[in-house]
Amino acid sequence: LLTGNQIGCFLAHYRISTLVRQGVLTSQNAGRACLIKTFVTTELQAAIANKFGLKVVNTLTGFKYIGEKLREYEEQLMSTAPPGAEYGALQPHEKRAAHLGRGCFFVFGGEESYGYLGTDDVRDKDANASALMFAEAMAGARAQGISVSDYLDKIYSIFGFYWEKLGQIVLEGAEGSAKISRLLESYMSKPPVAIGEIKVERCENFAKDTL
């Protein structure tokens, strides 16, 4: 069974490398392309994107925050568009060219809980499109004579193996909710300077900092 992170890395690498092979992404324009992920999602996706020169944007947990970034990129692009231009009227190749020319071209988005997106036409996790992306990536791997597991091994041989583990702390009821609020407030008002004997170099507030 593949984890959500493994599928995301498989799709991200295949999608980015395919766009590079097709000449859509080049060394000149890759800096205007981006991969968006939630900050609890594996950093292997970031390593893959950085290898190809793409920007990496981390968001709060939840796919709606990825959708918010896509809306932001649309608004930024249309702020420089001719009067009367409509984003929804643009064809996919026109959107891509515009974003790569003066905006931020969204290549892939994902989170570890099996949610993926390869286009900004949908602003939430898209199971239908994800299934098509996975089928295409599997076909691409098969054309190379390898399995999905083999493809992942190729990724690990380049970027190293990223060990992952999911865990959760459950605080139930009104008392639990109040405790969560107190903890969050304490972290924001007085960020920790050390964890055990390890010094904290910096703290990032994903709810306020520019991502």
Label each region the model flagged.
Residues 15:
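Catalytic core segments in nucleotide and nucleic-acid processing enzymes
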